[in-house]
Amino acid sequence: MPAEGIPQINLDPGAAEGLRVAVISAQWNAEITDKLHAEAIGAARELGASVEDWRVAGALELPVVVAAACKNFDAVIATGCVIEGETEHFRVVCDAVTYGLTRVSLDTGVPIGNGVLTVANHQQAVDRAGGPEAKENKGADSATAAIHAALVLRQIAAVG
């Protein structure tokens, strides 16, 4: 069940027919990121998108690889999981990744689904990673949001 206030984007199966989508995921916290990765791919394919996927070492590598993918894809989904520890490294990584992904999207005009979890503990990540035990599915949610944005951009381009 989605949390209160989260928008429900309802796209019909096949709505993304003809879209090329990349899913790029960090490998840190693999128990979580493997689920996010699979859920993002599944959601994009269910919507009819053509999907390619890659893995990178960690969340800090996502922005540069996503930037490269933006040259060849209509939408890109980035997933990862950063769990707070005892140092400021958590905040540095979270801020850098969020800024980097946003900057890439603005610079390229390609929608990027930010499925990078930034959580206080492992249970919060499990609760958001998708699957039967999860409360939310941020992999699928980020894919749907990026694809929806790509479709809106196509509609805007068609008007002009």
From Swiss-Prot:
Chain residues that bind 5-amino-6-(D-ribitylamino)uracil: 28, 59-61, 81-83, 114
Pathway membership: Cofactor biosynthesis; riboflavin biosynthesis; riboflavin from 2-hydroxy-3-oxobutyl phosphate and 5-amino-6-(D-ribitylamino)uracil: step 1/2
Keywords, alphabetical: Riboflavin biosynthesis, Transferase
GO BP, sorted A to Z: riboflavin biosynthetic process
Reaction(s) catalysed by this chain's protein: (2S)-2-hydroxy-3-oxobutyl phosphate + 5-amino-6-(D-ribitylamino)uracil = 6,7-dimethyl-8-(1-D-ribityl)lumazine + phosphate + 2 H2O + H(+)
Active-site residues, as the UniProt record annotates them: 89 (proton donor)
GO-annotated cellular components: cytosol; riboflavin synthase complex
Binding residue positions for (2S)-2-hydroxy-3-oxobutyl phosphate: 86-87, 128
A single GO molecular function term of this UniProt record: 6,7-dimethyl-8-ribityllumazine synthase activity
EC number: 2.5.1.78
Cross-referenced HAMAP family: Lumazine_synth (MF_00178)
Annotated family: Belongs to the DMRL synthase family.
Function summary: Catalyzes the formation of 6,7-dimethyl-8-ribityllumazine by condensation of 5-amino-6-(D-ribitylamino)uracil with 3,4-dihydroxy-2-butanone 4-phosphate. This is the penultimate step in the biosynthesis of riboflavin.
Name this polypeptide is given: 6,7-dimethyl-8-ribityllumazine synthase
